[in-house]
């Protein structure tokens, strides 16, 4: 199993989107940056904010693309290419409509499930979808016509509370990836209940 060398948190740039459901991936990267005591700094050649840290003696880069969600692959592709990071060494954190708020799942590979950020990352990595995903449940509005408005709005207070709890657990589980391995982290996160 490859070691994770790049952790990406997806979201949309700007204050307007900062607290919206679609930015759940960015929320987790910000928590990881605080946990690892590093600052995310703008890096124009990577189209995002980046940080470098050591986790359990291993060098890891954090990335929040500053492109809009549907162009996230531009940032991921640029950084991965520059540092020669393979798709299987990347963990992408993103919001997931098909999971209820307060849940999260880790997995490797798979389709994009209609998520435009994932779709662009797969394309920019040469149609390779073998990267890891940490999917943060945000719930579903009930009908596909409501999805765009739903992901670009703030969660309800109850959902925000559930998200805070699962983000705490996910932060711990990302650290477990580096200490005890992906399988242990996956088993713990995928069985988490609030």
UniProtKB/Swiss-Prot annotation:
Subcellular location: Cytoplasm
Broad EC category: hydrolase
Pfam families documented for this protein: Pept_tRNA_hydro
The species this protein was found in: Haemophilus influenzae (strain 86-028NP)
Entry annotation: catalytic residues: 22 (proton acceptor)
First-listed, main subcellular location of the protein, grouped into a coarse class: cytoplasm
Site entry (Discriminates between blocked and unblocked aminoacyl-tRNA), positions: 12
Protein name: Peptidyl-tRNA hydrolase
Domain of life: Bacteria
A molecular function (GO) term: peptidyl-tRNA hydrolase activity
Keywords associated with the record: Cytoplasm, Hydrolase, RNA-binding, tRNA-binding
Taxonomic classification: Bacteria, Pseudomonadati, Pseudomonadota, Gammaproteobacteria, Pasteurellales
Catalytic activity: an N-acyl-L-alpha-aminoacyl-tRNA + H2O = an N-acyl-L-amino acid + a tRNA + H(+)
The UniProt record lists the keyword Cytoplasm: yes
Homology family: Belongs to the PTH family.
Binding residue positions for tRNA: 17, 68, 70, 116
Described purpose of this protein according to its UniProt entry: Hydrolyzes ribosome-free peptidyl-tRNAs (with 1 or more amino acids incorporated), which drop off the ribosome during protein synthesis, or as a result of ribosome stalling.
InterPro entries per record: Pept_tRNA_hydro, Pept_tRNA_hydro_CS, Pept_tRNA_hydro_sf
Cross-referenced PANTHER family: PEPTIDYL-TRNA HYDROLASE
GO BP annotations, alphabetical order: protein quality control for misfolded or incompletely synthesized proteins; rescue of stalled ribosome
Residues at the site labelled Stabilizes the basic form of H active site to accept a proton: 95
GO cellular component assignments: cytoplasm
EC number: 3.1.1.29
């Amino acid at each position: 199993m490859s070691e994770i060398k790049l952790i990406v948190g997806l979201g949309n740039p700007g204050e307007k989107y900062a607290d919206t459901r679609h930015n759940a991936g960015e929320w987790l990267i910000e928590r990881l940056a605080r946990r690892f005591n590093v600052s995310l700094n703008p890096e124009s050649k990577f189209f995002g904010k980046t940080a470098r840290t050591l986790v359990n003696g291993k060098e890891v880069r954090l990335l929040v693309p500053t492109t809009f969600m549907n162009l996230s692959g531009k940032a991921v592709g640029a950084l991965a290419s520059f540092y020669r990071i393979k798709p299987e060494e990347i963990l992408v954190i993103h919001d997931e409509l098909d999971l209820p708020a307060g849940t999260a799942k880790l997995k490797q590979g798979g389709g994009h499930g209609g998520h435009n950020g994932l779709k662009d990352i797969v394309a920019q990595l040469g149609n390779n979808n073998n990267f890891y995903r940490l999917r943060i449940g945000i719930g579903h509005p009930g009908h596909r016509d409501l999805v765009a408005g739903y992901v670009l709005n703030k969660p309800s207070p109850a959902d925000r509370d559930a998200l805070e709890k699962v983000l705490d657990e996910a932060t711990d589980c990302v650290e477990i990836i580096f200490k005890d391995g992906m399988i242990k982290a996956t088993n713990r996160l995928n069985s988490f209940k609030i």
